[in-house]
């Protein structure tokens, strides 16, 4: 297919048109008074959202060059959401402002490479200043404030996330699911839970709840299938003498071995239960090792030269209780040593930092949560499916932003932190580098300007008032239309969100500004289908047999 090559200002101007169209669609969602965007779906009802990244992902432009510009900024919004959980609209608005201002200067004759160098230096200085301005999240109230702002000022969601984080800790896993009612709920599973249920309903001890409940059990961990009971007999005899329950976690328990365990359970000889080990392959081995460390036991593994016959009571783990239903097993208060658990947690954290696979990262985070304090499930309720999707998006955003706040701290929100950071930096640059730095500094006003515009206020007056305020915590509360102490009013942002949004915006804008040529496919208009209306006279063929 033939390609079209466009150079210099003409190429950059076309790219800018695409960025502008994307920005115009996304920026209306910004701030507490941001508007909704209605998105047509290929099937079903349209979706309504106030989430910047959801809007950005839907923007697909007809002109291929404009679409190239839009798709680069769309990628920035998406990347910002992945890294920080929020700040997608901020990143888009900043990228547009930097590109617009930079384009004007480059068209007037500035050197794009020098301009880029100045932009990078300014960005570095502002990020350093943001880190200085940040402060730790001190309590549940501040967690709720961050979550509320990221959930588009929904206090109920903010409080729900704060409750969840308080119960499972900052390393705990918090998942978001759709509720079956219109009410929001929070369910917390304490201890380690994995998705394997009892191997036989005959193990059930609580017929009303259909669960197996074992009090202070021993836990045997084996990484292969158990088919022959003879291998198990030595350890079963030792358990019988103690009078305590036993939970067996193995790859599988088959045939005669399972049948004999069930018979012993029914006769009251042993209080016993068995479940399959969670996961598959290498992940199964890792999770068995996690359970061993949590319960103070050892995995009996033939790879390490151990056989099931050689297992003793000293190899078994212990816990204060184990609850098993048909789908899940929960181990509460494992008897493992805290130092060993902490070492395992740090090992998994290091693996999370190194992995490049999103799937592996998700599974490692699940293992981390299971070891460090449980899982919280936020169930989101709504009256309609459209409302449910929109609300679930907001809860996901708020959750990620809250984790970012706990990780790196908070700064004042509402676009004010970028303006305060700008006022503190002093760069000694010359020529086009100085122009590049000035472009970034001017663009830092764009988020606050947009928040004020969306709320119906004079953006110039608002920006000027915040810039000239004597108290460095003063900002603009767009919901009330007042200048307030942002920290006292609970209008705060995670510093990670501001930092990532700025870095990504400068990165994409400088890429676009240093673009000197674009190559795109020439769309060929397909010929229209021939008009069939002139064939109406074929009725005369009716005499054919």
From Swiss-Prot:
One of its GO terms (molecular function) is ATP-dependent protein folding chaperone. It catalyses: ATP + H2O + a folded polypeptide = ADP + phosphate + an unfolded polypeptide. InterPro entries: Chaperonin_Cpn60_CS, Cpn60/GroEL, Cpn60/GroEL/TCP-1, GroEL-like_apical_dom_sf, GROEL-like_equatorial_sf, TCP-1-like_intermed_sf. Its EC number is 5.6.1.7. Gene3D superfamilies: GroEL (3.50.7.10), GroEL-like equatorial domain (1.10.560.10), TCP-1-like chaperonin intermediate domain (3.30.260.10). Its main location: cytoplasm. Keywords: ATP-binding, Chaperone, Cytoplasm, Isomerase, Nucleotide-binding. Pfam families: Cpn60_TCP1. PROSITE patterns: CHAPERONINS_CPN60. CDD domains: GroEL. It is found in: Cytoplasm. The keyword ATP-binding applies. ATP binds at residues 29-32, 50, 86-90, 414, 477-479, 493. One of its GO terms (cellular component) is cytoplasm. It comes from the Bacteria. One of its GO terms (biological process) is protein refolding. Belongs to the chaperonin (HSP60) family. Forms a cylinder of 14 subunits composed of two heptameric rings stacked back-to-back. Interacts with the co-chaperonin GroES. HAMAP family: CH60. Together with its co-chaperonin GroES, plays an essential role in assisting protein folding. The GroEL-GroES system forms a nano-cage that allows encapsulation of the non-native substrate proteins and provides a physical environment optimized to promote and accelerate protein folding. This is Chaperonin GroEL. It comes from Campylobacter jejuni subsp. doylei (strain ATCC BAA-1458 / RM4099 / 269.97).
């Amino acid at each position: 297919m033939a390609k079209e090559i466009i150079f210099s200002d003409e190429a950059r101007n076309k790219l800018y048109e695409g960025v502008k169209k994307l920005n115009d669609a996304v920026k209306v969602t910004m701030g507490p008074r941001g508007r909704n965007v209605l998105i047509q779906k290929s099937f079903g009802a349209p979706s309504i959202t106030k989430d910047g990244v959801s809007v950005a992902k839907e923007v697909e432009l007809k002109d291929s060059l404009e679409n190239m510009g839009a798709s680069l900024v769309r990628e920035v919004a998406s990347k910002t959401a992945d890294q920080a959980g929020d700040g997608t609209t901020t990143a888009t608005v900043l990228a547009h402002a930097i590109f617009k201002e930079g384009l004007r200067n480059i068209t007037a004759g500035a050197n794009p490479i020098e301009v880029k160098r100045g932009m990078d230096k300014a960005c570095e200085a502002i990020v350093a200043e943001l880190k200085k301005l940040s402060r730790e999240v001190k309590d549940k109230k501040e967690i709720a404030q961050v979550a509320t702002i990221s959930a588009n000022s929904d206090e109920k969601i903010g409080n729900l996330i704060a409750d969840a984080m308080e119960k499972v800790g900052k390393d705990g896993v918090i998942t978001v699911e759709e509720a079956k009612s219109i009410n929001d709920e929070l369910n917390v599973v304490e201890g380690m839970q994995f998705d394997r249920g009892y191997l036989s309903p005959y193990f059930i001890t609580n017929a009303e709840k259909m669960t197996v409940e074992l009090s202070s059990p021993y836990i045997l961990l084996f990484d292969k299938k158990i088919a022959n009971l003879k291998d198990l007999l030595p350890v079963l005899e030792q358990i019988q003498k103690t009078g305590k329950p036993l939970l067996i976690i193995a790859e599988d328990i088959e045939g005669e071995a399972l049948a004999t365990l069930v018979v012993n359970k029914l006769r009251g000889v042993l209080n016993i239960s068995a479940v399959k080990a969670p996961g598959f392959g290498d992940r199964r081995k890792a999770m068995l090792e996690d359970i061993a460390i949590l319960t103070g036991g050892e995995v009996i593994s033939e790879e390490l030269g151990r056989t099931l016959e050689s297992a003793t009571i000293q190899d078994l783990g212990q816990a204060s209780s184990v609850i098993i239903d048909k789908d899940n097993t929960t181990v509460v208060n494992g008897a493992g040593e805290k130092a060993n658990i902490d070492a395992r947690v740090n090992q998994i954290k290091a693996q999370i930092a190194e992995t490049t696979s999103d799937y592996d990262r998700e599974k490692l985070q699940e293992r981390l949560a299971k070891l460090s304090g449980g899982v919280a499930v936020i169930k989101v309720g709504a009256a309609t499916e459209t409302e449910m999707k929109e609300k679930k998006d907001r809860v996901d955003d708020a959750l990620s932003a809250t984790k970012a706040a706990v990780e790196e701290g908070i700064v004042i929100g509402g676009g004010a932190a970028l303006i305060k950071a700008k006022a503190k930096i002093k760069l000694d640059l010359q020529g086009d580098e100085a122009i590049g730095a000035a472009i970034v500094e001017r663009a830092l006003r764009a988020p606050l300007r947009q928040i004020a515009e969306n709320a119906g206020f004079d953006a110039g007056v608002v920006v000027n008032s915040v810039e000239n305020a004597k108290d460095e915590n003063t900002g603009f509360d767009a919901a009330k239309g007042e200048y307030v102490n942002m920290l006292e009013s609970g209008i705060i942002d995670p510093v990670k969100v501001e930092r990532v949004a700025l870095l990504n915006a400068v990165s994409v804008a400088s890429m676009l500004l240093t673009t000197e040529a674009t190559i795109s496919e020439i769309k060929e208009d397909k010929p229209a289908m021939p008009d069939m209306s002139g064939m109406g006279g074929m009725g005369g063929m009716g005499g054919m047999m």
